[in-house]
Regions:
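Short, amphipathic alpha-helical interaction segments embedded in low-complexity terminal/linker regions
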Residues: 1-45
């Protein structure tokens, strides 16, 4: 099963303001749709 928690790398991207990169990395890893990925990344901000 795939973890829907953010990785340290993804959290660093969010902290650096690289939201598009974080969303892409999260989607590539989890296979979720864009809306779900964006909501997850936004929640981590």
């Amino acid at each position: 099963s795939t973890s829907l928690e953010l990785t340290d790398t993804e959290l660093r991207m969010v902290a650096d303001g690289r939201l598009v990169s974080a969303i892409k990395a999260y989607r590539d890893r989890t296979g979720v749709d864009l809306k779900t990925a964006k909501a997850t990344i936004d929640a981590a901000r």
